[in-house]
Amino acid sequence: MANYNVYFSPTGTTERVVKHMGESFGSMENIDLSRRDMKNHEMEQGDFCIVGVPSFGGRVPGIATERLRKIKGDRTPAFLLVTYGGRAYEDTLVELKDVFEAQGFVCIGAAAIVAEHSIAHQIEAGRPSAQDYDELDTFAAEVKERLKGNACPVEVPGNRPYKEYKVLPMDIQVSDECMGCGSCVESCPVGAIPFEDPKMTNGEVCISCMRCVEVCPQSARSGNPEKVQMISEKLKMICQPDKANEFF
């Protein structure tokens, strides 16, 4: 029997949440969906898997869906986890469930965890909080009990067909602080930054995941300030503060 943490986590939040959940289940192997060199994986019926993704506009990020299809289960129990920046996760959980069930997994639990927005950081700033992690610990205990029996597949909210998947171009900008170290080139989940010119970003390939901004040691990369401001103002109007996590 083996336990796995599976995550797509451009800015690190989803990875932290998944790994925190995994601490309740002992030793875990990690599978990082953001790696372009990700290998195929096969899991057995006696294994257990926690899979987490951020919600991108109410959907599973497209590249995460592609890489989840490299993982095969054999009626392997799985826990689904979605992080979102305080607006809504819409069809993300149900899409994640559909994708993973099609790969041979039985989804015995799920959670939608509120997190600091990866672009408009003032939205749900500081989350997940200590209280959020306490809630996750409490639910992890319930999931452990479910694993002892013949747990039924969980139902999660969302619509089929899913809402249209859209990528909001962030027009990533690079300042003169860039040293050409290549951290962004290596880390980009979709290979949108050319090695020979790391100050460039291929806007047709970029998924606006903000990973390059997060990993830059010089803080030289940023989203277009006008677009960041526009997103921030819109979210301030539509997001309710201190949104509750949801567990299923």
Across the structure, where does each feature detected by a protein language model lie?
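Short hydrophobic alpha-helical module
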Residues: 139-146, 181, 187-191
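Short secondary-structure boundary micro-motifs
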Residues: 156, 161, 176-177, 189
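Iron-sulfur cluster-binding cysteine motifs and their immediate structural context
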Residues: 174, 183-207, 211-228
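Charged, low-complexity surface patches
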Residues: 88-89, 177, 205
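FMN-binding flavodoxin-like domain, especially the glycine-rich phosphate-binding loop
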Residues: 2-17, 21-169, 225-248
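Charge-patterned, long linear interaction tracts outside catalytic cores
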Residues: 164-186
